[in-house]
């Protein structure tokens, strides 16, 4: 039977991608349905109990700047917060938080259940309703049909998921959850390229059986950072320490002696695993010269005895897992309460997607998260927000939106996926962004919140907070520009005491702040330049904008040159066989990728500058040279 109500957008899957997608579509005013196999696992952290990190924290800040959920949920659930790369430049500084699994899930579910325009329904989806190459709904396991104008697939590792522990394996979406077999089979019938990937998780350890006195504690930062631009440290629950131990030669010997029982090394697992989060058996074999590997023992929550040993993801048999754990200092008597495992699952080639994450072949069908070949909660959540936004726009017959590479790490993410695809689980790093000085954590709201407001994602509270912050920054910078001191000023000795060389000519506050020996706090402590801003976010922004102004200006000039290519559009249905002068290799690659712009085409491996020139000349001759606004 058909459900009586029609929806604008259906989201299939309630993980990090699905929850952000559902919230985004609903915030835009679209009637949204979130279909999940289990309401109790909405927003579940399936692997490590942490949010953020290098590149990943940048994505979380961008999600927050666009009105998303992840940063706010982390502030309510975070039990340890740290700024990584704190001693380095602002472009690569990143926030990371340990999170209480239960509190995180509760924060996500509470937000979903209180979001207007959003309905949640518990049923596993087994089929899509596709008519004339357009998706129009979904069918659940009991035959209930839901109709919608757009559908977003955020099914994680559930598509034909297979769990491996040693040489044994069984079907599963993750430990304790069933796989999605019927939906996987249905999607394989569509004109989409599909492949297999693999990821893994470590065994969980009972904290009561660990001798923490032998371990090095790792504490969070003080003052405690926050993730959301609207957050404050008072929202955080009780803070906890992590601890550090190490593998050793005994650990490595256990692993080497049992490689024949590893499903990876026995050839049972076909999917490729994440390069930057390898299993412990992979680390031991790939880095044979290393005598030890650092392992972080991370608490799973305030009310749990479970410890997540970050660094020993494994699919070796349980008896070998026990030997590995007990070979390490402080864990000699440790008990495992959940075995580690590897999971293989279907993913769909993201080159078959537009930068909006809509399928090039099935109208109204959007993909987000691990189904696109990514790994990580943050990458999934960012894609989910974008897919939910664009599904909402599609349902309202509006053009899709996606950020450019110079506007957001989210732009880098979707451009990499839709242009280059991936053969291994893709994770974000700051090194993937060529304009990372512009794409800092601290300015994510300045880059994206105004756009989010225009798109209908940003509510009045966030907009008022943002507008006040922008005004504060502008006024403070103008104030510093207006205050001048000269070598004979009354208070010049106070300033000279901070400088390597005495002031030799007149200077204003911004010029003094550009000097490496002076920061904003020091400058505003001087009689002439006080008082300082009380909002630390605004104060940091003033300092960064002033100190890095020259570098930022140069990078902006580079971006403007590149934008000419980015804004030159390519027809979606163009057959590149028509373009005389292109080599067969270039024609094949362009027809395979179907790039949406000259800029995107130029980033495809093997597409030369000469080929781009030929293409531009041909477009002009044919009267097809169009540029986006």
Curated annotation (Swiss-Prot):
Gene: mnmG
Record keyword Zinc present: no
Record protein name field: tRNA uridine 5-carboxymethylaminomethyl modification enzyme MnmG
Principal location listed in the UniProt entry: cytoplasm
Subcellular location: Cytoplasm
Source taxon at top rank: Bacteria
Quaternary assembly: Homodimer. Heterotetramer of two MnmE and two MnmG subunits.
Gene Ontology MF annotations: flavin adenine dinucleotide binding
HAMAP family in UniProt: MnmG_GidA (MF_00129)
GO terms under cellular component: cytosol
Family: Belongs to the MnmG family.
This protein's record includes keyword NAD: yes
Cofactor(s) required for function per UniProt: FAD
Amino acids binding NAD(+): 273-287
Function field: NAD-binding protein involved in the addition of a carboxymethylaminomethyl (cmnm) group at the wobble position (U34) of certain tRNAs, forming tRNA-cmnm(5)s(2)U34.
Binding-site residues, FAD: 13-18, 125, 180, 370
InterPro entries: FAD/NAD-bd_sf, GIDA_C_N, MnmG, MnmG-rel, MnmG-rel_CS, MnmG_C, MnmG_C_subdom, MnmG_C_subdom_sf
